[in-house]
Amino acid sequence: MTSRFRHVALIGKYQASGARAQADARDGVMEDIGAFLESQGCEVFVEKSAAEEADADASVGGRYQPLTVEEIGQRCDLGLVVGGDGTMLGIGRQLACYGIPLIGINRGRLGFITDIPLDNYQATLIPMLAGEYEEDHRSLMHAQVMRDGASVFDALAMNDVVVNRGATSGMVELRVSVGRHFVANQRADGLIIASPTGSTAYALSAGGPLLHPAVPGWVLVPIAPHTLSNRPVLLPDADEIVIELVAGRDASANFDMQSLASLAIGDRVVVRRSDFRVRFLHPRGWSYFDTLRKKLHWNEGGS
């Protein structure tokens, strides 16, 4: 069976470092997947950072042409991401503007968005490469940190934007506005603005609801609020959300927990819906509810 995707970028462990990343680069998985893709008629490239990690034994870095993220966006029609959800978050944000679909092979832990098991990837990928797949689009958030009327930090987020206190400081006080409307001043350890994708991450641990990916909304979740009546709020993603730091020391804004901006009193974190979306491809028959049931261990012990 010949692949409908002619130019495939192999992307792996995009932000990993240290002993685990070095072991991953040398265990032959990336090389095996690359050889499999070639057997399906694909021209294989490797993302530059993955190539540099693999250069220790030249298993991947020396066999396939390395490309920057920009070059992948311009030359490839599929990205195959090998890693965990963090790997997918990082590359998904960067490739969203190019509209390239992504397939995730899970070698992390939970794997909500890298959903193909490593031990069964060949049987799963063969029909997908031939065009038998489910397509799933995920929204992105565009966030800016505004200081004295100027943007001092700018980032995309697929999971969440989190404004929180410093590790050794007390609560922060945050002024929250949605659209043109003032919501409240909240005293808490922090506040999470989560997308549907991020509703299964930090927001879920903080007591937020699950939000189906097809819902055009965000969820606003307080972290350990001083007032117990402060509850998660579901919002339309067409509205701009503004979080202003009123009081607190060593506060910061985190974007997918992969980039961070320190905040000063009076700084405003402005979150809007991005114009870009991430395209995921899943095996035929994939269901969001199957993922929830498996990853959250629903029905365990039941009939």
From Swiss-Prot:
One of its GO terms (molecular function) is NAD binding. The keyword Transmembrane helix does not apply. Coiled coil: none annotated. It catalyses: NAD(+) + ATP = ADP + NADP(+) + H(+). GO terms for cellular component: cytoplasm. One of its GO terms (biological process) is NAD metabolic process. Keywords: ATP-binding, Cytoplasm, Kinase, NAD, NADP, Nucleotide-binding, Transferase. It comes from the Bacteria. Pfam families: NAD_kinase, NAD_kinase_C. Its cofactor is a divalent metal cation. The keyword Repressor does not apply. Its main location: cytoplasm. It is found in: Cytoplasm. Its EC number is 2.7.1.23. Belongs to the NAD kinase family. Involved in the regulation of the intracellular balance of NAD and NADP, and is a key enzyme in the biosynthesis of NADP. Catalyzes specifically the phosphorylation on 2'-hydroxyl of the adenosine moiety of NAD to yield NADP. This is NAD kinase.
